Amino acid sequence: MKLITRNTDYAMRAVCYIAGQDKMSVSAEEMVTRLKIPRPFLRKILQTLSGEGLLKSVKGQGGGFSLACPKEKILLTDLMRIFQNAVQLNECVFKKKICPNRGTCVLKKEIDSIEKDVFRRLRGISIASLMKDGNGSRSRRKGKCYGHSASRH
């Protein structure tokens, strides 16, 4: 079971990096260098995020990417939905086959309950909250997100 895929992680790091910059837009090349994300992956991720309306892109000299909405409004679950489709922690071993225990399976009911709690908590995580350090203040290093330092000087 993998809760966060590599593409979701890369997307989250890129969005955090963009959100932490003071400039109007951030180039893909800058993010490749700073975030150490392979160029082909990053380009596809940025295009997808632009297509989904989370990023704005400007082409040409001085172009790049910027947030299309406030970082407080971009949720980790948005990125998970875009890059992972339906996220499911518990998948019954019988899949879609007929299960004699379908209505009475105690383990499934418990895991479903845990899954609901996990997703309730995930829906409360925004890019802005990921960019804060443990005591709720903005990180001193711009673009710090999810244990990755996007900006090293």
Q: Where are each of the predicted segments found?
A:
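Basic amphipathic alpha-helical segments that dock to polyanions
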Residues: 18, 45-50
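Beta-hairpin "wing" of winged helix-turn-helix
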Residues: 53-68
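Conserved segment of winged-helix/HTH DNA-binding domains
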Residues: 71-96, 111, 115-116
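Short helix-capping/hinge SLiMs at alpha-helix to coil transitions
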Residues: 19-23, 69-70
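A short alpha-helical element within helix-turn-helix/winged-helix DNA-binding domains
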Residues: 29-36
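C-terminal regulatory/oligomerization modules of transcriptional regulators
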Residues: 96-153
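Short amphipathic alpha-helical elements of helix-turn-helix/winged-helix folds
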Residues: 13-21, 82
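Key DNA-contact positions within bacterial/archaeal DNA-binding proteins
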Residues: 40
